[in-house]
Amino acid sequence: MQVAVVKYNAGNIFSVMNALRRLGVEPLLTDDADTLRQADRVVFPGQGEASTAMDYLRQHGLDQVILSLRQPVLGICIGQQLLCRHSEEGDTECLGVFNADVVKFRPTNHEDKVPCMGWNMIEPVVNPISKKVNPLLKGVADGGLHQAAGQGWVYFVHSYYVPICDDTIATANYILPYSAALAKDNFYATQFHPEKSGSAGEQIIKNFLEL
């Protein structure tokens, strides 16, 4: 299996590549359009600022490449946010895969700290028709730093979030409930960092590789 990691001006890419290696996959870091299109899986990770990242993607034609992908794609952290319509960060028009906008956390009291940083529970959304969680999240309730019925613990670092929407497949709560993970067609995304989330995160990456 060839797994391509999108090469662009965003941080934390090598942590993702190391997480893939721990699962026996040797990822390819690339910004080549043909290589990305031909890969079996594509990971779109990163930490950074939305407008700077989108400017880079557009200048290098990667925005259209990402939108053209038909294999499973996993956006992580800012990767999830860039797959949405718009971000308040820099008033940025994004890729528009998910029908949602990205907004900034607004503290409601002195105890609310932004950015949100640390471990938090996610709760997978059960599909009302299939009565199952999204395949990306299969088995997550059995892993993570801690355990709770129907929930998993994962690691977050972010100041902006995606409100709960039709594409939400898992929620988290920090200041207010929001989307911890999204899915639409062949695109999947997590606001948290599965590569830093212990056994729960490893399970999510494994699930992605098996989609």
What are these regions (language model features)?
Residues 39:
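An anion/phosphate-binding loop that grips the pyrophosphate of nucleotide cofactors and donors
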Residues 68, 101-211:
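Amide-donor transfer/coupling interface in amidating biosynthetic enzymes
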Residues 35-36, 65, 181:
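Structural alpha-helical scaffold elements that stabilize or flank donor/cofactor-binding regions
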Residues 3-25, 195-200:
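N-terminal beta1-alpha1 ligand-phosphate binding loop
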Residues 1-4, 186:
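Extreme N-terminal starter segment of soluble prokaryotic enzymes
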Residues 48-120:
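Cysteine-nucleophile active-site neighborhood
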Residues 43-45:
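Structural motif
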